[in-house]
Structure formats: C-alpha cells, structure tokens
C-alpha cells in the first residue's frame, strides 16, 4: 500500500488526449485542466499570495498535433481524497476526447520517467516494400543526424532512440518507436518524422494535401522498461 505524505500529498492522474484536442497548446491544456479541477471541487492545495493557484505538474508535454493515450498530471491535495472519487469528479467535467484513465498516489517522480512509446503513421502517395525497407535501414544506422530546431547545427539522436521499426499496414507505413523521455534528454517524435522525410522522401510530394502523418503516444516506462506509474 502506498504511504501518502499527509503534509504534501500529490495525486497522479493518467489521461488521454485525442481528436481535436491534439491541436491545443500546452498552455491551453493547463488552462483547461485548471477550470476542470476547480469545477470538480477537489480538496486542492493552493499557492499563497494575491493570485492563489492549485499546484499542477505535467510530465513530458506534447507538441501540437500529437494524440496521446498516456499523459500524466500530478495535483497537490490539501487533504486525502480517494483516487477513484477524484477521477469520477474530473471525468464528469471532461469531454470524450480527454478523459482520466487512472488515478493514484504515486511512489515515483516524473524525473524517473525515461522512455515513451509512440506510433507514427505515414500515408504516402505511393507505398512499396522498398520504401519500408529504406525506412528501417535509415533508422538502424549508428548515426541518426537531424537539424536542431531553429538551428543550422545537426545532432545525433541515435542514443535517444531505444527502438524503431517500420512496417507496412495497408496503404500506410507505421513506425513503432520507443524514444527518450528523460527530462534532460527528451526526444520529440517530430524529429523522427523530419529524419524520414529527409532520408527516405516521405511527405515530400509537391501537393501538401496528398500525404499526411499522425503521431500517437502510447505508453511510458522507467529506465528498465517497466511501465511508469
């Protein structure tokens, strides 16, 4: 049984963010969650001062345009509340595109989160086995170089990729990848998209509406690849 610190107790919520909500910014997510948890009438701990706010901490914020089955938020409570009761109160104020799936008092910290799994789905104009094989060849290289964001410098993201495998699924190429989620070395899955576009020609059709891709975050892990919670 988890021993809850009565003086500083955080309740952890795992939640999904799908559909149109993939396009809201992290700041908008924080604002939305703030409204929801206030409506849920949870026994929240508030900061002191002229503008008291509840203590909310999020793990590995997503980029705009990424769906997720695995988001985490820690809320500091002023007193104990049963996790299932807290989850029910919050979900009553949520849409189907964002729902709490688990609530519990954690024994881990967000700094213990080391890996996250993703599914990247590409729908090119033309698909064949050679293109799938090329994706796997490029992803298996010892050096996987991409341009840094807003920079002309390159970086090798190979150490931040635990695994990445491309397969053909119907008219799509699906890449299942486990990427670093370490707060000091977080790898945005958009870098995998950028790399495959540059090296394999994915998403390079002159008609920008002809091809598309989707990213779904699936799960989170400790350093030993046991499920994070």
What is each residue range found by the language model?
Residues 8-9, 14-16, 20, 24, ...:
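Extended, well-folded interaction surfaces typified by the phenylalanyl-tRNA synthetase beta subunit core
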Residues 11-13, 73, 115-122, 173-180:
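Short, hydrophobic beta-strand segments
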Residues 20-22, 30, 34-48:
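Short Lys/Arg-rich amphipathic alpha-helical segments
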Residues 45-75, 107-109:
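Short, charge-patterned binding micro-sites
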Residues 69-119:
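Ordered, amphipathic secondary-structure segments that act as subunit-interaction surfaces
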Residues 78-83, 124-127, 182:
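Helix N-cap motif at beta-to-alpha junctions
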Residues 85-94, 130-140, 192-193:
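Short amphipathic alpha-helices in soluble, non-transmembrane regions
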Residues 140-229:
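Core RNA-modification/binding signature centered on pseudouridine synthases
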């Amino acid at each position: 049984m988890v021993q809850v610190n009565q003086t500083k107790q955080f309740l952890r919520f795992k939640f999904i963010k799908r559909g149109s909500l993939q396009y809201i910014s992290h700041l908008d997510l924080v604002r939305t969650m703030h409204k929801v948890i206030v409506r849920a009438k949870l026994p929240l701990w508030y900061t002191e001062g002229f503008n008291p706010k509840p203590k909310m901490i999020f793990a590995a914020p997503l980029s705009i345009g990424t769906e997720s089955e695995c988001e985490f938020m820690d809320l500091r409570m002023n007193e104990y509340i049963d996790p299932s009761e807290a989850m029910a109160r919050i979900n009553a104020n949520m849409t189907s595109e964002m729902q709490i799936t688990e609530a519990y008092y954690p024994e881990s910290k967000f700094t213990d989160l080391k890996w996250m799994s993703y599914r990247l789905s590409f729908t090119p104009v033309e698909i064949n086995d050679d293109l799938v094989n090329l994706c796997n060849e490029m992803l298996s290289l010892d050096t996987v170089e991409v341009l840094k964001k807003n920079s002309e410098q390159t970086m090798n993201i190979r150490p931040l990729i635990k695994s990445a495998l491309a397969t053909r699924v119907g008219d799509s190429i699906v890449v299942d990848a486990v990427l670093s989620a370490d707060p000091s070395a977080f790898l945005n899955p958009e870098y995998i998209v950028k790399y495959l576009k540059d090296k394999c020609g994915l998403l390079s059709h002159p008609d920008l509406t002809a091809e598309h891709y989707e990213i779904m975050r699936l799960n989170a892990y400790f350093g030993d690849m046991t499920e994070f919670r």
